[in-house]
Amino acid sequence: MAKRKEVTEISEMDIKKSGFVNRLYRETCDISNKYIKFDDDGDKLIIPNKIDFIKKALNKISSTKDYSSFVRQLNNYGFTKIKLDNGDSNCDIYYHQNFHRDHPDLISLITRDKSKNGDYKDNMTTFINSLQYLASCNYKQQKEINDLKDRIKTLETKYATLYEIISNAFRQGIEQYQKHNTMYFNNNSLLKNMFTYNQELDDLKDNTNVYNNAKLINQLKLDAKNSNQDDNIKKTKNAFDEFYF
């Protein structure tokens, strides 16, 4: 919250010009006076509680004890009442383009029109101040809009960068996953091929053993047959020998 500025020295000439406005500025700047103050930006006059203001601070600014008379004085000097959004009827806010906490040099420009057409002039002054207030509000709103645009642009840049980082990380994750699956598939295929080869080798060994066993059996059979034939020949020969001799 902005600090309220200390009371600035006001020349006697300024006091003679407008004692009411200078007293108003002095009390509004006085940090010990909580019944009337500037807003945070220092460009609007705030009376937080009208009842407390009438009891504690009105007599320091105006000779009247009537709040309506005090408001008329503000209107005569061109102050514009600002409508509150919250509808608090016990709080009043006023604006004047030359009544600013940080620009006491502008106070001398706040004057009361004393011409015959005073009512018209006062209304014009109030109207001009209202336009000035609207222009000030529009400027602030435009500044806020520009600030929001800058923030949105910054957020969009950060979002794009973050999106790119996440996309790259996701893409790398997919690539690693695919590489892992490929290696896993290759390893499985290799193990499967090795298992098949070993199985085929075992089968081949079994078949070889069977073949060798069969061959051995056939050889044994053949040897046995040959042996029988030899025995028969010997027997025949012996018989022949016995017959002739």
UniProtKB/Swiss-Prot annotation:
Homotrimer. Homotrimerization increases the affinity of HSF1 to DNA. GO terms for molecular function: DNA-binding transcription factor activity; sequence-specific DNA binding. DNA-binding transcription factor that specifically binds heat shock promoter elements (HSE) and activates transcription. It is found in: Nucleus. It comes from the Eukaryota. It comes from Enterocytozoon bieneusi (strain H348) (Microsporidian parasite). This is Heat shock transcription factor. Residues 130-169 are annotated as: Involved in trimerization.
